């Protein structure tokens, strides 16, 4: 008995150290297993932890998910930690996406996921039901208005004239590399601020000034991603105690609110001073056409418009240029098309020897449009999205969905499935978007998901294409860009498909055409 008691006392003295050692061993084993997991198998479903260690230890979530979806026939069940309601259905099956966004649309509202993105407030992004219908009708009125579109096109042309071309020209003359992703993000931030708030922040200048709003917006989206992979109870506790990613979000939120509310106040003050002005920005539209003057309403909608325009357009153009660096023959075809357009155009615009493309000139740029579609297919700005099931359901793939269960679907993975896009799915091939008659080929939205699908399909799709074509055409026609030798292009693990290290390029002026 004495020996037994002594042994127990010895063990109890070292009990904490033993527990820590066991915990460290388990964590190390989990991470090692997760990293060595074969692409031909699902992540190991550990007791307590589920498959989460495989996600946490992987720095390329989109490729990790794609490999598993390919092996498992486009859909699989992801098991989260026990008792934390973190099980997901992962899918890239077009029939499942069509089911959620079209056939059974009402069963997959924003619902609880709106709380994850509460920084957007009560707007078209988070709304459901009648409120969403009201928001969508107002957004349609704004985005399809001729004056609004003309104002945007004019400002974009002026911004190219006064900022984009001078900066690229300076980089060419000085032989100084520039981060094209940063240039395009600044460009679209300036243009989106003008179209939404009638204000030009002038972030795209030779000095490349800090842009607190843009930094805060990126931090807010990263915090939202953290909420997705964190048990709801945990991130709510972090928010309550104001720590970690929730503290970062709170600080970013204040920066975002300060900027937008200040711009709304400036616009209202200007209107009060000079009376109603002929401005066709989104905020003025809400006040003039819908008699909505509530600052919170205007803030929520302004933030959504700003992010939608700034992020999706800039990232699409950035990835397009990366694809052109990898496929120079495609760039030559675009250049040839643009030369034909310029030769036939009576509306050629010059700026110190540079040619500017306006919204009329680029309407016939079919091959450029196809190249943008291909960039959106392979590099979707939003590589994955998540839906909540309101009621129990069965997906076309045969997978049962519990009420409240989350479904993650991946447009990024969809683009990489031979059964969806053919054996050449990994190739950057604009020709897949052009018919035998030389017209653009239509693909159903649940297959080409860059602009969403069903009743929630993006209202600004054609406007976005027009604006991107103006910018890309002007850059390609006037400059030859090359990626800096040795520069590494890597996706960020983010809600958005941005480049972790940017896109560093050398710029040369093209010879006179």
From Swiss-Prot:
Pathway info: Alkaloid biosynthesis
Topological relation to the membrane, as annotated: Single-pass membrane protein
Cleavable signal peptide: none
Matching InterPro entries: Cyt_P450 (IPR001128), Cyt_P450_CS (IPR017972), Cyt_P450_E_grp-I (IPR002401), Cyt_P450_sf (IPR036396)
Substrates-to-products reaction catalysed: 4'-O-methylnorbelladine + reduced [NADPH--hemoprotein reductase] + O2 = (10bR,4aS)-noroxomaritidine + oxidized [NADPH--hemoprotein reductase] + 2 H2O + H(+); 4'-O-methylnorbelladine + reduced [NADPH--hemoprotein reductase] + O2 = (10bS,4aR)-noroxomaritidine + oxidized [NADPH--hemoprotein reductase] + 2 H2O + H(+)
Top EC category: oxidoreductase
Major site of localization recorded for this protein: membrane
Residues reported in the UniProt entry to bind heme: 458
Regions crossing the membrane: 14-34
Subcellular location: Membrane
GO cellular component, one term: membrane
UniProt EC number: 1.14.19.50
GO term, biological process aspect, one: lipid metabolic process
Keyword Phosphoprotein listed: no
Record family assignment: Belongs to the cytochrome P450 family.
Name under which the protein is recorded: Noroxomaritidine synthase 2
